[in-house]
């Protein structure tokens, strides 16, 4: 069976990648990632039970989160580390099973497929012996890559035959992947929430349960949105408690003459460690793509060698990384196949990986040693200037709420007629130029609220301001879409409205990968309707599932700039 992947917006032909991923992943990588998800589901079966009887599940919790994150689009292309993850997962699964048995669980080793119902309350249907059949995901084991390959052939997306059940299972899984990404960053800063892990396990097990109806899976998808809000709130707390609340900041997009390191991705802990270790070395630090919002945090502003932001969204990295001249640290997605001309300057860390590039692992105390990349930078030329000037950002919820009187007055007087939430992701497709044109053509009495790398389609345009309020308010990274929700809820309260949809806010969101999926589900949980997704609707939505979203939530897509602006403004 050939590979099949349709988790990102660029799925081939709007249907799915079957030969090689548009992202660059090979068939082997795609299938290994399918197997990782299957192993994670097996672990979830046991960790759910272990949690119920009070056993420590921290190792499994961490593995589930990291594994889901490692399969996000453009995160990891390293076959060796992905296969090692499968092997590690099988060991964790066995360890959990042994711990449950030791704690009093009953396991029929001869039949190798039944546990007593006392310890399998989340599995299957009771048989006439008051036992439940255990899923293959819980019992499958192997110890070599060849067996991994054979198993991977049988556990991919298309293993679920019913199109609608498959669609809902994948929608739920992709929401969990996005949730895992945000939880990983919070965990790295010492913040966690057991209820989020418990839901993730419950949802993973549910994707194995053939007795669940489409309605039951739909309810789980919406529940996923609730935990999406929770995880974004947790990460917001982690980031702001550690580094302060983002504040209005002018960010330099030019360069200096010192050698530099470019840091990309989302992990602020890595950002902090890199700034500390480069201080006094003569090496400058620049952010790239989704790391741009690090410039807004007060804690990072004390570093004089933190220059600003270099370049644009992730998909332009082939050209921009070449021009940067120095080494690049990829802390998370998005990494694309590097050119030979700069591949030796790429370093990965965390769950990110690419075959043939250097990976920086943490030591036993959790800290990372960036000395190799720092010494590498010293041997490199300074960055080539590709832009100059400044961009402004830092409009997360705390900053915007500080401006609330000014914003509310502008709405009441009619100076601001409507807000447009244009959060989300950027990507390669030329049709995404729609978002640049949309921003340009919006009436001058409108304000764009953004988060994520979608901002690069318009954050360098001169769109002016309204009574001193910039017409593009950048809250931060994709997870800072949480800030946009907080702002909307506060405005609802200020204007004494019953329904969040009564606000003069329209949602025109560009999506790309699975973090955008959890943001969407979170917005649906908060009651937001009439969200428009583009440049295309997800390939993983079957016609019937798409119909549910359209009929119940008013989900739509984009058409032309003129038609859409007219529709939104009416």
From Swiss-Prot:
Function description: Catalyzes the reduction of hydroxylamine to form NH(3) and H(2)O.
Q: How is the cofactor bound?
A: Binds 1 [4Fe-4S] cluster. Binds 1 hybrid [4Fe-2O-2S] cluster.
The UniProt keywords, alphabetically, are: 4Fe-4S, Cytoplasm, Iron, Iron-sulfur, Metal-binding, Oxidoreductase
Pfam name, any one: Prismane
Which parts pass through the membrane? none
Entry-annotated residues carrying Cysteine persulfide: 425
* Gene Ontology cellular-component annotations: cytoplasm
InterPro entries, alphabetized = HCP/CODH (IPR004137), Hydroxylam_reduct (IPR010048), Prismane-like_a/b-sand (IPR016099), Prismane-like_sf (IPR011254), Prismane_a-bundle (IPR016100)
Q: What is this protein called?
A: Hydroxylamine reductase
**Originating species:** Clostridium botulinum (strain Loch Maree / Type A3)
Which EC number(s) does UniProt give? 1.7.99.1
What HAMAP family has UniProt attached to this entry? Hydroxylam_reduct
- Gene name as annotated: hcp
Q: Where does [4Fe-4S] cluster bind?
A: 5, 8, 17, 23
- Recall the GO molecular function terms of this protein's record: 4 iron, 4 sulfur cluster binding; hydroxylamine reductase activity; metal ion binding; peroxidase activity
Please give the biological process terms from Gene Ontology that the record holds: response to hydrogen peroxide
Listed binding positions for hybrid [4Fe-2O-2S] cluster are 266, 290, 334, 425, 453, 478, 513, 515
Required cofactor names: [4Fe-4S] cluster; hybrid [4Fe-2O-2S] cluster
Location within or outside the cell: Cytoplasm
What the record says about family reads: Belongs to the HCP family.
| Reactions this protein catalyses | A + NH4(+) + H2O = hydroxylamine + AH2 + H(+)
Q: Which NCBIfam families match?
A: hybrid_clust (TIGR01703), PRK05290.1 (NF003658)
